[in-house]
Amino acid sequence: MLSGGWCPVRFSEPAHWEEDLAELDRTLDLFAAAGGTARPVFGDGGSDERRANPGRGGEDRSLGLDEAGWRHFADGLRRAEELARDRGFEPTFHAHTSTFVEAPWEIDRVLELSGVGLLVDTGHLLIGGSDPIQALRDWGSRVNYVHIKDVRLDVLRGVVRDHAGAIEAWQRGIFCELGTGDVDLDGFFHELRAVGYDGWICVEQDRILRDDEPISESAEAQRRNRAWLREHAGL
């Protein structure tokens, strides 16, 4: 069963709305063909500057949108929401590193400007400067999808120090196997139960394989992640 799918839109750039919303419409065709109640996962298209500065949105507000940019963002997001709902799908918004919605105040702004639900991604939230557990407490009423990831903050510090970009962050292994990084996943699952969440949980480990690394290594990593979930989260 399809639980969701990534639908990037350059919300703050009206010149790209026609192209991006047409692509969203084609993606919704695939959702409809698959059946079920998959969630369109809206993500901001970001910019070259944000992609060159992963994790910096939480500490440098100059990388963010100005007021005109936020007005365009709100209008673009409204159009995407209407398109999804007109086709029978309830969307969610994914705060994601290297986009214009990464830091806690950027997430607050999206929730203030729209009625869209929120996807809580433990990895991207931590990279952007949010506490995933506090995110559930602050935004729990809007959460309608969850991504479980773990993150190595030592890798993030190196990426920021070296002014490395998003692809380099992935290649360095910023996202790691569950239980081997710095996300308090045990505490997160405890809070997830406390807020009564009963929706989809998607387990992810974003990575870029080396040329000499077989695809089977990714499969083995997911088996280890599955074992961690059974032991620590009872899933």
Task: Give the positions of each predicted feature.
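Histidine-acidic metal/acid-base catalytic patches
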Residues: D29, R78, E82-R85, P104-D108, ...
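Short, charge-rich amphipathic segments
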Residues: G4-W17, L63-A74, V120-G129, D150-A169
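A broad structural signal for short, well-ordered beta-strand segments within beta-sheet-rich domains
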Residues: M1-L2, V143
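Active-site beta-loop-alpha junctions enriched in small/polar residues
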Residues: W6-F11, G45-S47, H96-S98, G123-L125, ...
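Active-site acidic/histidine proton-transfer and metal-coordination neighborhood
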Residues: M1, F11-L118
